[in-house]
Amino acid sequence: MAITKEDILNAVAEMSVMDVCDLVKMMEDKFGVSAAAAVAVAAGPVAGPVEAAEEKTEFDVVLVDAGSNKIAAIKAVRGATGLGLKEAKDAVEGTPFTVKEAASKEEAEALKKQLEEAGAKVELK
């Protein structure tokens, strides 16, 4: 006997919220889709450029310059990326270097602060 949609719905209804989140993530990975809801935009008046731009949610943390204390910058890059000593040294000396891609705003700000405390110059893109 085949499993019906109703059987699946009942099984999901009995799951905890964490289990449902894990299930959604697994489905996204398996089928290569995103569970983000599609939002329809209402047509507004045809005017000049949009005044309130959508706030960016993902940032790339880019090391622009290591600064005067390369050793501290290398340590900070190693801590942030998990790179080995040679790879981190090459990254710091070969700036610009993308330390982290698609980081959340909070994570990007924290990483930027950590790298700047080590004397590096960092940009969020």
UniProtKB/Swiss-Prot annotation:
GO biological process, alphabetically ordered: translation
Bridged cysteine pairs (disulfide): none
Annotated keywords: Ribonucleoprotein, Ribosomal protein
GO cellular component, one term: cytosolic large ribosomal subunit
Top-level division of the source organism's lineage: Bacteria
InterPro entries the UniProt entry points to: Ribosomal_bL12 (IPR000206), Ribosomal_bL12_C (IPR013823), Ribosomal_bL12_C/ClpS-like (IPR014719), Ribosomal_bL12_oligo (IPR008932), Ribosomal_bL12_oligo_N_sf (IPR036235)
MF terms (GO), sorted A to Z: mRNA binding; structural constituent of ribosome
UniProt family annotation: Belongs to the bacterial ribosomal protein bL12 family.
Chain's role: Forms part of the ribosomal stalk which helps the ribosome interact with GTP-bound translation factors. Is thus essential for accurate translation.
HAMAP family: Ribosomal_bL12 (MF_00368)
Subunit structure of this chain's protein: Homodimer. Part of the ribosomal stalk of the 50S ribosomal subunit. Forms a multimeric L10(L12)X complex, where L10 forms an elongated spine to which 2 to 4 L12 dimers bind in a sequential fashion. Binds GTP-bound translation factors.
Protein name: Large ribosomal subunit protein bL12
Organism, as annotated: Francisella tularensis subsp. holarctica (strain LVS)
